[in-house]
């Protein structure tokens, strides 16, 4: 019977081999008011391997701080504190 009732298969929750932690905003926890472009060590944590800014949905950063982070990274790149791309490493 091609149009008969399908058997009930219970779906198992997808088991992710990597443990995902709950994301939280590091700047809210630390009580940061303004993100400084001169704090290069903090900014490097929010830049991926290919020198792209990591989105807030992956880092857990709130929208207010993500905008400040975006501006701070762009200023640091303009002042040559951070690289624009990873091409120069080759």
UniProtKB/Swiss-Prot annotation:
SUPFAM superfamilies attached to this UniProt entry: Ribosomal protein S18
Alphabetical list of InterPro entries matching this protein: Ribosomal_bS18, Ribosomal_bS18_CS, Ribosomal_bS18_sf
Keywords for this protein: Ribonucleoprotein, Ribosomal protein, RNA-binding, rRNA-binding
PROSITE patterns in the cross-refs: RIBOSOMAL_S18
Any Pfam family the entry gives: Ribosomal_S18
GO cellular component annotations of the record: cytosolic small ribosomal subunit
GO terms, molecular function: small ribosomal subunit rRNA binding; structural constituent of ribosome
TM region positions: none
Gene Ontology process terms (BP): translation
Known function: Binds as a heterodimer with protein bS6 to the central domain of the 16S rRNA, where it helps stabilize the platform of the 30S subunit.
Family: Belongs to the bacterial ribosomal protein bS18 family.
Self-association and partners: Part of the 30S ribosomal subunit. Forms a tight heterodimer with protein bS6.
Name of the molecule in the record: Small ribosomal subunit protein bS18
Taxonomic placement: Bacteria, Pseudomonadati, Pseudomonadota, Betaproteobacteria, Burkholderiales
Gene assigned in the entry: rpsR
